[in-house]
Amino acid sequence: MNSASKLFVVLASPANQRNMATLKDLKIRLGTVKTISKLTKTLHMVASSKLRSAEKKAEESGPYSVGPQKVLGVVETADAFNTATEPIEDRSNKQLLIAITTDTGMCGPVNHQIIKTIKALLKDDAKQEILVSTTGLKGVAPIVADFPNQFLINGRDFGKADYSFPEVLLFLNEIISKVPNYDSALVVYNKFKNALSYSVDRQFIPGFNLLELNRDKFYEYTTSEDRAATMKDLSEFYLASSLWTGLYQNRASEMAARMVAMDNASKNGESISQALGLQYNRARQAMITSELIEIVSGASAIESSD
């Protein structure tokens, strides 16, 4: 074996091969982390820009549910329902539950809080038959997995930036066609407070049967001769208005949560990149030092053998 061949054997030692494999793995992982960090930064900027318009629409949609709420005396109706001792005539013991979730993830605990609230309501209330509908894909699987017999439908196409009131009405018509005689409805969504804060909110909407408990207050208003039909229409309109408001409130909360989540992910990515960079440089320096030592040792051994 000549001198060059002996030197190649030294450089191709198992220790050097292991070091090269470690460096390659570190380099691949470092590149992956940097790529993901770029993606999270982009998502943060997108969520930040969308939050402005979502916040504006959430504020504008708020008053839509205030008027019907005052007319129907929802607070008094809810109290009467909770404290009623006499059987309610034609009561169906059916409550509609509408959970507003998102179509996409990476938005913190927004969907988890809604699903947790829905499951708690389904487990705790044994007096009523609660039927659940959802908007957004993220709420379907967790609810269907635990309560398949109580799930009605999922409303799609509500994850986009804008949607019309008729779209909300079509979704509600589909629900009401399946459960025409319901006692009450509950819309559960994330109420937007600011860019760093939101909380789960519940909007109670009485059905026609429960409105009868508060009919004296309602009859103070001048209506058409068919007051029962008017009350039913107002109840359904209030349900649509509450869902309309909840959708925009939830979207603003989604954008705020995604902005915070992606900002935290970007910061974590930078920390991991720095740590991997230091680890890579140390491993590379150690490999170079080891190779130099082996080269010098190999050269000395070759000279001695010659």
Swiss-Prot record:
Q: Name one GO biological process term.
A: proton motive force-driven ATP synthesis
Q: How does it sit in the membrane?
A: Peripheral membrane protein
Q: What is its main location?
A: mitochondrion
Q: Which UniProt keywords apply?
A: ATP synthesis, CF(1), Hydrogen ion transport, Ion transport, Membrane, Mitochondrion, Mitochondrion inner membrane, Transit peptide, Transport
Q: Where is this protein found? A: Mitochondrion inner membrane
Q: Which GO molecular function annotations are given, in alphabetical order?
A: proton-transporting ATP synthase activity, rotational mechanism
Q: What positions does the transit peptide occupy in this chain?
A: 1-17
Under the heading SUPFAM superfamilies, the entry gives: ATP synthase (F1-ATPase), gamma subunit
Gene Ontology CC:
mitochondrial inner membrane; phagocytic vesicle; proton-transporting ATP synthase complex
Q: Name one Pfam family in it.
A: ATP-synt
Family classification = Belongs to the ATPase gamma chain family.
Q: Subunit arrangement?
A: Component of the ATP synthase complex composed at least of ATP5F1A/subunit alpha, ATP5F1B/subunit beta, ATP5MC1/subunit c (homooctomer), MT-ATP6/subunit a, MT-ATP8/subunit 8, ATP5ME/subunit e, ATP5MF/subunit f, ATP5MG/subunit g, ATP5MK/subunit k, ATP5MJ/subunit j, ATP5F1C/subunit gamma, ATP5F1D/subunit delta, ATP5F1E/subunit epsilon, ATP5PF/subunit F6, ATP5PB/subunit b, ATP5PD/subunit d, ATP5PO/subunit OSCP.
What functional role does this protein have?
Subunit gamma, of the mitochondrial membrane ATP synthase complex (F(1)F(0) ATP synthase or Complex V) that produces ATP from ADP in the presence of a proton gradient across the membrane which is generated by electron transport complexes of the respiratory chain. ATP synthase complex consist of a soluble F(1) head domain - the catalytic core - and a membrane F(1) domain - the membrane proton channel. These two domains are linked by a central stalk rotating inside the F(1) region and a stationary peripheral stalk.
Its recorded name reads ATP synthase F(1) complex subunit gamma, mitochondrial
| Origin species | Dictyostelium discoideum (Social amoeba)
Q: Recall the taxonomic lineage recorded for the source organism.
A: Eukaryota, Amoebozoa, Evosea, Eumycetozoa, Dictyostelia
